[in-house]
């Protein structure tokens, strides 16, 4: 059964970025490893949320990313991530989905990533 998307729905996951994974990612993007996690490495978190599984195997396109970085994420530290489905709507022949990923440590927001995806396939069923 597919997960149903409703505006305002949210889900929580705990995670950590292991230093070796961050080192590898940094070498791929040409950044010197300094113990901090590059913000766009957080893209690997999206598939970990059940809410995002509606897109598994579907052709979606990322069209907008907004990152608000309040404090750097550090390797090998446990964080709490909250994924919120902000909005879904039909725009011309596309379905548009807006999600917000908020990453916290000790009840303090470290980073917010808002991303907009589109799909032509009508996977949401508008």
Curated annotation (Swiss-Prot):
Name the source organism.
Staphylococcus haemolyticus (strain JCSC1435)
- This chain belongs to the protein called Protein VraC
Task: Write down the superkingdom of origin.
Answer: Bacteria
